[in-house]
Amino acid sequence: MAIERTFSIIKPDAVAKNHIGAIYNRFESAGLKIIAAKMVHLTKEQAEGFYAEHSERPFFGALVSFMTSGPIMVQVLEGENAVLANREIMGATNPAQAARGTLRADYAASIDENAVHGSDALASAEREIAYFFAADELCPRTR
């Protein structure tokens, strides 16, 4: 198994409901280490840039509006098969279809306000990490 890094967002809905600590606990309980984190209130331009791959999709405007509606937590997670591990912790995009005990089943209200984002592959993880963090902001946990 490979030690990987993945990118995660706790979205405005979950931040507003004070679920940050509970979500971090889930990451750590699953063996993922938080090696970088910060709270950010995205500008429209930042949100559009981050989600540029969806710019032609009908939900793009609503997504940008939601992601700029309040602060978010962005973090880098490190661990065994971190990309897949985080996706399993998050659950299905639609919380109505998410397995019990996943973040979206427990903390998301709808498919639009679904509490968390996680990279879907190593390549997207690298791109998304670089969007929010400089290399010197990553703090590998060696102890």
From Swiss-Prot:
SMART domains: NDK. Its cofactor is Mg(2+). One of its GO terms (biological process) is UTP biosynthetic process. It catalyses: a 2'-deoxyribonucleoside 5'-diphosphate + ATP = a 2'-deoxyribonucleoside 5'-triphosphate + ADP; a ribonucleoside 5'-diphosphate + ATP = a ribonucleoside 5'-triphosphate + ADP. InterPro entries: NDK-like_dom (IPR034907), NDK-like_dom_sf (IPR036850), Nucleoside_diP_kinase (IPR001564), Nucleoside_diP_kinase_AS (IPR023005). GO terms for cellular component: cytoplasm. CDD domains: NDPk_I. It is found in: Cytoplasm. Pfam families: NDK. Keywords: ATP-binding, Cytoplasm, Kinase, Magnesium, Metal-binding, Nucleotide metabolism, Nucleotide-binding, Phosphoprotein, Transferase. The active site is at 117 (pros-phosphohistidine intermediate). ATP binds at residues 11, 59, 87, 93, 104, 114. Its main location: cytoplasm. The keyword Kinase applies. It comes from the Bacteria. It is an enzyme of class 2 (transferase). Its EC number is 2.7.4.6. One of its GO terms (molecular function) is nucleoside diphosphate kinase activity. Belongs to the NDK family. Major role in the synthesis of nucleoside triphosphates other than ATP. The ATP gamma phosphate is transferred to the NDP beta phosphate via a ping-pong mechanism, using a phosphorylated active-site intermediate. PANTHER family: NUCLEOSIDE DIPHOSPHATE KINASE, NUCLEOSIDE DIPHOSPHATE KINASE DDB_G0292928-RELATED. Homotetramer. This is Nucleoside diphosphate kinase.
